[in-house]
From Swiss-Prot:
The gene is amer2. GO terms for molecular function: beta-catenin binding; phosphatidylinositol-4,5-bisphosphate binding. Residues 565-575, 601-621 have a biased composition (Low complexity). InterPro entries: AMER (IPR019003). Negative regulator of the canonical Wnt signaling pathway involved in neuroectodermal patterning. Acts by specifically binding phosphatidylinositol 4,5-bisphosphate (PtdIns(4,5)P2), translocating to the cell membrane and interacting with key regulators of the canonical Wnt signaling pathway, such as components of the beta-catenin destruction complex. It is a peripheral membrane protein. Keywords: Cell membrane, Lipid-binding, Membrane, Wnt signaling pathway. It comes from Danio rerio (Zebrafish). Residues 9-18 have a biased composition (Pro residues). This is APC membrane recruitment protein 2. Residues 60-70, 427-454 have a biased composition (Basic and acidic residues).
Length: 654
């Protein structure tokens, strides 16, 4: 009313000129003309506040009326709904007995009461939300928190009520088709997604764990999908036979068949099997979380196991038996570990859940790797098999081939199997590839055990003859050297020496001096300075061959006495352990390169030397003659001459 009276006042205020800007505003708000426009603005603001208050009062009155009208109208509506539903149910079941006709009445009454309770709850929640927001002043955050707090028990109560309704109205499902449709909808709401992995009763525990583990592996291993499919189908066949734990197994079997299978199964299953999972899930939610956690742990463990067995990384392969295989060669250990992982996955996929539960348990990797390498060696051609016969030279050759310079303490059983797989990997025919060059010099100097087994070394030396590219079968009878091969090797040796070594150390083709240097490495440290210090006391072969340079026959006689001693002593101790110091590795690994440049081969000469000299008994006392010749310093020229003479004389001795 205030607004209307104020709006009727403007006609007496009209004596203003029509061109003024304030005329419309004063007509609206009915204020007299003042000296400035500022009071009019303030008056407009006050008027707006007053009109807003009045409108708010009227709106509040209207809101309270509508709210009260809703509350008063709902019971009559509910009564009408109740009457209609009861009448329809009576018409549906007119020919049924009295005991059955009372059931739809009860179901309709429970439905109407649930609807009424839902309305009451929503209205009270809205009123409480507005009052709490107005009183506490939390804003939207407080409103949402209060609504969430009341929403959780409401959902549980509603689902329980729906379960009761299904239990009461289950007897009528066969007669009425409309109620069957509603029942199908209700069963879909009975089992929400977070209840997928529920703890089943005791007789079904093992089946549930099997299904859960199979589902976990199904994502990681493609091999096991064939095993997983039939097992899940078997679980479904089991669910149709046993009534009580069947909904649980249907849930764990597969989510993709969940809706169809649940809607079809629940029509034939008694309703006593429907309600326990609901009560169990509401009463014990922590058990569900623990089951989910365990299932995720199973999937993690299976993925880790398959990943490690395929790629060869991780802690599962960190066994002392497999370290030798991994250190030996990348290809042999890679094939062994991958085949071991595949076999382990197939074994575990067949249903061994005990191996699946322990993450640190490797599925028989060493035996499988040794089997794989043995099969690889069995498939080798015939001309390569005599080269795989001796065992210890293979181990030392692998150390030189890897170039890591570490001593590998590996068990002998794994050495046999894993090192055989390396032989077919090394190239045999082309002389330019560096792999056989690195592997061969240590392969011919057999360790101490090969002194007891000379025939194997003979076979090794004979098998190495065609590798060098020159036929040496006729050079095994003893003969004295002639000067032309000495000159030829003296011409070939310096290019391999110059430009590669910075220090005045001996050339790489000086075999006996390098062996004495290896023996010295065992007695002292492995540093680079110790190499030059240890070389001086061990250089008698260079000095002796330098003194005897005038007569080649005399140098050959000396080499008969001097050359065996470093060969046998160093082959007894140093060929397997001289790789400790990585500083000596470049010099040792460059030895066969300079030897391969010359037409006469060192492989045949060294194999025959070690085979001829290992049974002799004159070699140990000749080692005592070595220390007196330590007075000549190291230089390049005598080393080259001694290297050339040692190679020529050792080859011509055969």
């Amino acid at each position: 009313m205030e607004v209307q009276t104020e709006c009727s006042e403007p006609p007496p205020c009209d004596p203003q000129p029509p061109g003024k800007l304030n005329k419309a505003a004063f007509k609206l708000f009915g204020k007299r003309k003042s000296g400035s426009s500022m009071p009019s603005i303030f008056s407009v603001r006050n008027k707006g506040e007053s009109t807003g208050k009045a409108a708010g009062k009227t709106l509040e009155l209207v809101r309270s009326k509508t709210h009260d009208g809703l509350i008063t109208d709902t019971p009559s509506e509910l009564d009408s709904h109740r009457k209609e539903e009861s009448a329809s149910s009576d018409q549906l079941h007119a020919g049924t007995p009295d005991g059955v006709s009372t059931a739809p009445l009860r179901s309709s009454i429970t439905k109407s009461f649930s609807f009424f309770s839902l309305l009451r709850r929503s209205s009270s929640r809205a009123g409480d939300g507005t009052t709490t927001v107005g009183r506490r002043g939390r804003g939207l955050k407080g409103l949402f928190s209060s609504m969430r707090w009341r929403r959780k028990p409401q959902i549980q109560e509603d689902t329980l009520e729906v379960a009761k309704e299904v239990k009461e109205g289950d007897l009528i499902l066969s007669s009425s088709s409309g109620s069957v449709k509603t029942e199908k909808d209700m069963t879909l709401t009975l089992e929400p997604l977070p209840q997928v992995f529920e703890e089943s009763p005791l007789p079904g525990d093992s089946d549930k764990w099997k299904v859960a583990s199979m589902q976990g592996i199904q994502g990681t291993n493609e091999v096991e999908c064939g095993n997983c499919g039939p097992s899940v189908s078997q679980q479904h066949t089991v669910t149709e036979e046993s009534p009580a734990p069947s909904p649980l197994r249907v849930q764990t079997g597969g989510l993709q068949n969940h809706k169809h299978s649940s809607s079809t199964h629940l029509s034939s299953i008694p309703t006593c099997a429907l309600t326990p999972p609901m009560e169990h899930s509401t009463a014990d939610p922590q058990s569900e979380q623990s089951v989910d956690r365990l299932c995720s742990m199973f999937t993690d463990v299976t993925s880790l196991k398959s990943f490690d067995s395929l790629t060869g990384c991780g802690d599962i392969i960190a066994d002392p038996e497999e370290d030798s295989g991994n250190g030996g060669s990348a290809t042999s250990s890679g094939t062994g570990s991958s085949s071991g992982g595949c076999m382990g996955r197939r074994l575990s996929g067949a249903g061994t859940n005990s191996e699946r539960c322990s993450p640190a348990k490797p599925p028989l990797p060493p035996q499988v790797s040794s089997l794989a390498s043995i099969h690889a060696s069995c498939y080798m051609p015939a001309h390569q098999r005599p080269r795989a016969a001796p065992k210890k030279p293979q181990g030392s050759g692998v150390v030189a081939y890897m170039g890591g310079g570490e001593e590998m303490a590996s068990p002998e059983g794994v050495d046999d199997a894993d090192m055989q797989g390396l032989w077919h990997m090394l190239p045999q025919k082309d002389e330019d590839s560096p792999a056989p060059r690195r592997a061969e010099p240590v392969l011919h100097h057999a360790p101490a055990r090969l002194e007891k087994r000379p025939p194997q070394v003979k076979a090794l030396g004979l098998s190495k003859i065609p590798v060098s590219g020159s036929s040496k079968t006729g050079k095994q009878q003893p003969s004295r050297p002639s000067p032309p091969p000495v000159d030829k090797e003296l011409q070939d040796a310096p290019p391999s020496d110059e430009g590669y070594w910075d220090s005045p150390t001996p050339g790489p083709e000086d075999e006996d001096s390098t062996f004495l240097r290896r023996d010295g490495l065992l007695r002292d440290s492995c540093s680079g300075d110790a190499l030059y210090d240890l070389y001086d006391p061990d250089s008698p072969s260079a000095a002796g061959s330098d003194d005897d340079a005038s007569s080649p026959t005399k140098s050959a006689g000396d080499l008969k006495m001097n050359l065996p001693s470093p060969k046998c002593s160093s082959s007894a101790t140093s060929s397997f352990r001289s790789m400790k110091g990585s500083t000596s590795l470049p010099r040792d690994s460059k030895i066969p390169i300079s030897v391969r440049q010359t037409p006469p081969s060192h492989s045949s000469s060294q194999g025959a030397l070690s085979s001829n000299l290992s049974p002799t008994s004159t070699t140990p006392p000749k080692k005592t003659d070595a220390p007196p010749r330590t007075k000549i310093p190291v230089s390049k020229v005598p080393v080259r001459r001694s290297g050339g003479k040692s190679t020529s004389t050792s080859q011509s001795r055969k």
